Amino acid sequence: MENRWQVMVVWQVDXMKIRTWNSLVKHHMYVSKKAKGWYYRHHYETKHPKTSSEVHIPVGXAXLVIVTYWGLTTGEQPWHLGHXVSIEWRQGKYKTQVDPEMADKLIHCYYFNCFTASAIRQAVLGRPVLPRCXYPAGHXQVGTLQYLAXTAXVGVKKRRPPLPSVTKLTEDRWNERQKTQGHRGNPIMNGP
């Protein structure tokens, strides 16, 4: 029987980001109780030797599974040390990979308070606006004019500790897209 390979998207991350992610997830599961129904699986509970932890987040009839790995092939720099994260959407037997922005949007929709259409109307009428967006990482796009006006009226309140964000977990120097320099920064186009 031949070896069967399975290709996965794995985001290479720093070890400290994984520690921060795990501690934020545990805090919101056990202390603040905002992550109801989430399941944290330790490395000794998994069968795979390179899995350091798993977080199962129920999203409707499906589950979002964030798996952190250790001991993968070392990266280009010494601080990489082969730590990584994969994000899966599972529903029954179906599994697919999800990018961090989509994972944050799914978590935002199901678990954390956000502005509603009535909040904008209440702010315009001068009534107190109770719902605040408790998970701003779930908004990847630029807000509408009404949303920006409502945030200006209500104000933004920093949360301590912050809510766990998959985008923040995977964002790092080596995961960012290549940024091309403008015409002034390109020595080839400007000449010597």
Swiss-Prot record:
The record marks X150, T151 as: Cleavage in virion (by viral protease). One of its GO terms (cellular component) is virion component. It is a peripheral membrane protein. Residues 160-192 are annotated as: Disordered. The keyword Zinc applies. One of its GO terms (molecular function) is RNA binding. GO terms for biological process: viral life cycle. Residues 54-72 are annotated as: Interaction with host APOBEC3F and APOBEC3G. Residues 151-164 are annotated as: Multimerization. Homomultimer; in vitro and presumably in vivo. Interacts with viral RNA and Pr55Gag precursor; these interactions mediate Vif incorporation into the virion. Interacts with the viral reverse transcriptase. Forms cullin-5-RING E3 ubiquitin-protein ligase complex (ECS complex) by interacting with host CUL5, RBX2, elongin BC complex (ELOB and ELOC) and CBFB/CBF-beta. Within the ECS complex, Vif interacts directly with host CUL5, ELOC and APOBEC (APOBEC3F and APOBEC3G) substrates. Belongs to the primate lentivirus group Vif protein family. The BC-like-box motif mediates the interaction with elongin BC complex. The HCCH motif (H-x(5)-C-x(18)-C-x(5)-H) mediates the interaction with CUL5. This is Virion infectivity factor. It comes from Human immunodeficiency virus type 1 group N (isolate YBF106).
